[in-house]
C-alpha cells in the first residue's frame, strides 16, 4: 500500500477537502463529516473521567469545550493556516476577544493598528479598559510609532492582513520582527485575506484569527470564529505570560506550556476562557463551515478575479473620487506590499469614494439591485454598505478620518456572480445619482 494520506504533504486544495477526516467515518462509513449533535459524552469509568478532566487523556469532556464535528473543522483550519492547533468559537468577535484576553490581563497593555474593524476598535478602546486592559492605536505603516508604543507591560501587537474597510496591506513580517524584539507575540486577523491568499504564520505571526462567517463559510449561513496557534512563540523565554507558563490555580495547578507544549495558547483558551464564558460554536455551524472550506480556493479565485475587474471599472469612472484598493494604489509602499503578500491578487472587499456627500453615497447604495445592503462581507453574493453610518458608526469623526473613512465612502464586497452583471448594477446606480 502507498503512504497514508495523513502522512503526505498535501497541497492547499486537497487539504481543504480531507484534513481531519482522511478516511470515512469509522462507525457509519459516511464520507461526509457527520454532525455530532450532542451536549455531552459517556466516560468508560470514573478513572477515565478523571483523566479527561485532568487533561492527561485527550478527548471529549463536554459540549461547551469540544465536539467531534468541531474538531474536524479545527484540524482543517490549522492545517490550512500552517498552525499546530485551532479553536473554533461562536463568532469572530469571540475569537478576537479570547485571543487578546489570553495575552493581556488587568494592568497590561496592547498595541493595535488603527485600521482595524470598527468592532475590534471598540472592544479595545472602550470595553477592555473596563477590565483594566489599555490599548495604544498606531499607524501600522509608521514602524517607529509601532515600536515606541510598546511599553514594559505590553503583551501583544494586533493587526489585520488587510485593513478594514480600505484593504490596505500591512507588512506582517516587519511588525512581527518588532514584536519579537520585545518578546511579545503578533496576532493577525486574516479574515479578509484567507489562508488561500496569505498565511501570516509564514511571515512571523504567532496567532491568527478569523471571522469564519466571512470567506470560510462563504454563504452567509452561519456565525463563527476561529483561533489558530502558530506554536512557535516561546512563552517561557519571554517571561511575560505566567498564566501560560506557571501553575494555574484554576486548573489543578497545571502549567499549560508543560501540559500542551506548542499548542499551549489555544489549549488555555479552551480550558479556561471557553469553559468559564462559553462562547461555544454549535456542531451544525462547524458543519456548515466545513462545507464552505471545501470550495474556499475556488470561491476566492473568483472573488479576486471579479474584484479586480470592478476596481478597474471604478477607477476609470468619472463619478468616482478615489478607489481604495492595493492593486491601484499610487503609494509605492502599498504597491510593494501588495506584490509581496498578494502575488495572485487579492482584496475583494474594498472601498471607494463617490463624488458628492454622504447623501450621494446613500442614494447610490439605495439604487443598487444586485448588491445586498447588509453588515456581512465575503459572501458569494455581492454586498454593499455605508461604513461611516453603520459598521464604523461607533467611531468619532476624528477616528473615522484616521481610518480613512469619509462621509462619501462606500464599501463593496464583490461576490462570485458574473462580473458583467455586477458592473451593470453599479452603472445603473451611478446613472441614478
Question: Language-model features: where?
Answer:
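Short amphipathic alpha-helical segments
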Residues: 58, 84, 285, 289, ...
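N-terminal "arm"/small-domain region of PLP-dependent enzymes with the aminotransferase-like
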Residues: 2-67, 75-76
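PLP-dependent enzyme catalytic core of the Aspartate aminotransferase-like
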Residues: 1-3, 125, 134, 152, ...
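Well-ordered beta-strand positions enriched in small/hydrophobic/aromatic, beta-favoring residues
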Residues: 157, 225-227, 323, 350, ...
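Conserved PLP-enzyme active-site core in the AAT-like
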Residues: 2-8, 20-24, 86-316
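Short hydrophobic/aromatic beta-strand micro-patches
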Residues: 228, 351-353, 413-415
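Conserved N-terminal alpha-helix of the aminotransferase class I/II PLP-enzyme fold
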Residues: 45-97, 119-126
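Conserved small-domain helix->loop->beta segment predominantly found in fold-type I
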Residues: 277-280, 284-286, 295, 300-302, ...
Amino acid at each position: 500500500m502507498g503512504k497514508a494520506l495523513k502522512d503526505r504533504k498535501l497541497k492547499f486544495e486537497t487539504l481543504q477537502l480531507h484534513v481531519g477526516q482522511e478516511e470515512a467515518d469509522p462507525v457509519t462509513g459516511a464520507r461526509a463529516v457527520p454532525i455530532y449533535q450532542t451536549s455531552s459524552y459517556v466516560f468508560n469509568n470514573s478513572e477515565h473521567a478523571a483523566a479527561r478532566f485532568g487533561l492527561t487523556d485527550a478527548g471529549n469532556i463536554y459540549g461547551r469545550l469540544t465536539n467531534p464535528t468541531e474538531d474536524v473543522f479545527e484540524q482543517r483550519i490549522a492545517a490550512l493556516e500552517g498552525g499546530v492547533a485551532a479553536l473554533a468559537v461562536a463568532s469572530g468577535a469571540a475569537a478576537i476577544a479570547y485571543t487578546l484576553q489570553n495575552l493581556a490581563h488587568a494592568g497590561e497593555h496592547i498595541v493595535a493598528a488603527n485600521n482595524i474593524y470598527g468592532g475590534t476598535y471598540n472592544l479595545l478602546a472602550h470595553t477592555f479598559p473596563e477590565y483594566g486592559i489599555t490599548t495604544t492605536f498606531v499607524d501600522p505603516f509608521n514602524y517607529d510609532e509601532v515600536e515606541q508604543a510598546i511599553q514594559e507591560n505590553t503583551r501583544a501587537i494586533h493587526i489585520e492582513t488587510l485593513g478594514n474597510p480600505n484593504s490596505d496591506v500591512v507588512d506582517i513580517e516587519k511588525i512581527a520582527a518588532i514584536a519579537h524584539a520585545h518578546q511579545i507575540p503578533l496576532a493577525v486577523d486574516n479574515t479578509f485575506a484567507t489562508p488561500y491568499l496569505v498565511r501570516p504564520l509564514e511571515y512571523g505571526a504567532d496567532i491568527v484569527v478569523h471571522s469564519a462567517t466571512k470567506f470560510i463559510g462563504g454563504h452567509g449561513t452561519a456565525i463563527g470564529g476561529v483561533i489558530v496557534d502558530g506554536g512557535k512563540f516561546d512563552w517561557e523565554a519571554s517571561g511575560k505570560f505566567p498564566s501560560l507558563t506557571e501553575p494555574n490555580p484554576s486548573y489543578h495547578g497545571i502549567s499549560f506550556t508543560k501540559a500542551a507544549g506548542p499548542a499551549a495558547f489555544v489549549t488555555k483558551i479552551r480550558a479556561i476562557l471557553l469553559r468559564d464564558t462559553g462562547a461555544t460554536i454549535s456542531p451544525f455551524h462547524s458543519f456548515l463551515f466545513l462545507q464552505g472550506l471545501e470550495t474556499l480556493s475556488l470561491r476566492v479565485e473568483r472573488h479576486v478575479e471579479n474584484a479586480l475587474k470592478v476596481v478597474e471599472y471604478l477607477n476609470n469612472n468619472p463619478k468616482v473620487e478615489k478607489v481604495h484598493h492595493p492593486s491601484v494604489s499610487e503609494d509605492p509602499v502599498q504597491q510593494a506590499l501588495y506584490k509581496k503578500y498578494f502575488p495572485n491578487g487579492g482584496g475583494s472587499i474594498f472601498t471607494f469614494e463617490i463624488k458628492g456627500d454622504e447623501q450621494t453615497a446613500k442614494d447610490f447604495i439605495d439604487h443598487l439591485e444586485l448588491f445586498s445592503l447588509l453588515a456581512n462581507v465575503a459572501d458569494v453574493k455581492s454586498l454593499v454598505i455605508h461604513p461611516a453610518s453603520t459598521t464604523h458608526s461607533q467611531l468619532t469623526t476624528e477616528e473615522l478620518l484616521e481610518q480613512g473613512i469619509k462621509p462619501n465612502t462606500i464599501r463593496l464586497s464583490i461576490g462570485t456572480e458574473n462580473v458583467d452583471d455586477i458592473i451593470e448594477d453599479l452603472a445603473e446606480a451611478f446613472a441614478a445619482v
